[in-house]
Amino acid sequence: TLTRPGVILREIRIKPGERYSQQKVERIVGRLMRLGYFKKVEEPILFYTSGNEGGLLLRVEEGQSSRFDGVVGYSPASGDEKGYFTGLVDISLGNLLGTGRALSAHWQKKDRRTQDISLRYREPWLAGWPLHVGGGFSQLIQDTTYVQRDLSLEVEIPLLDQLSIQAQAGRTEILPDSIGSYKFGLLRSRTLNAAIGIEYDSRDDLLNPRQGVYYATTYQSGRKENLGPQPLLTGEVKRKTGTRRITLDLEFYTPLFQRQIVALGLHGRQFVSGETIVPVSDQFRLGGARTLRGFSEDQFRGSSVAWLNCEYRYWLGRRSRTFLFADYGYYSAQRASGKLQEFKLGYGLGFRLETGLGIMSLDYGLGHGDDLLGGKIHVGLINEF
């Protein structure tokens, strides 16, 4: 196989010469499949060499652990504004050279003038210990009004087969241009933060699950320093302030009848600081293929956002499905004119289809009040290699 034997041995948590444990043997298939390296893992076969000594025979079929994910969206013309395309490219190299190391890159064009990039690396089992470390860099160019850069260092400790905790330290820098500063009141700032989180994952497949639960939550605390421009640092502006950021992701997958599955996802984000009005650069974005279908990418912003994804799926195969969906979103933000909060509903249908080029995805979503031909089309391609 491509995956090195030492990687398999450390993941099954059984050492050579260890006393036989039926409980550990029963966990082998699940542990290896959750890595995402293998297409198939057979049940271990116990054999004896002499007396009470023996071994385990493991048969695995190497999978395609690296992925290319591309999405193309089209926002139709509205009034005097012409329609335009949006796009996303995700490249994930999972199990580099069979070592379990991972490298990923991301690029996204959200609208005419906004794009972001990111790069991440993960080193598993640092120095042979069950300790995974990683780091990342990201940059967002938002509407030509400001640039946001993030650096982070992460540590993950597996506690159980499906449960792990994470810790993170990072730095965020906001660099507005003159338009962002004087028209929108954005300040040049630097934030140092630390976060802790927990993750639980019992899904039977990462790309097309039929059953299981995924849960992740993080709590981040930071110290923000506003640096300028000097004319905007008035007495009403706090030079230094504390920040808190909370995230929650919860997903359920339940089979109902043969090939029919209900998928529910609940997601929430909240940002709190000592500032009366949270700057645009600290707000969360809502809308688009991965949050609220039927609306443009990042169409809404708020210091608090939440969305519910509901899908009724018909399972077509290992990597294929068709579905009906309804997405319900909420966002709120404190503005100079008062508090703004709204609920949004999107609905539609879509499919994921395994082809020779990869997994093709297409969602057609309508926002509440849209006519039948006025929806948003989200097209994507996931290629495993």
Question: Which residues fall in each region the model found?
Answer:
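C-terminal soluble interaction/assembly domains
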Residues: I14-R19, K339-E342
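Short glycine-rich, acidic/polar surface loops and turns
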Residues: N309-E311, S337, K344-R352
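A short pocket-lining beta-strand/turn micro-motif at the edge of beta-sheets
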Residues: A306, R318-T322, F343-Y347, T355-M360, ...
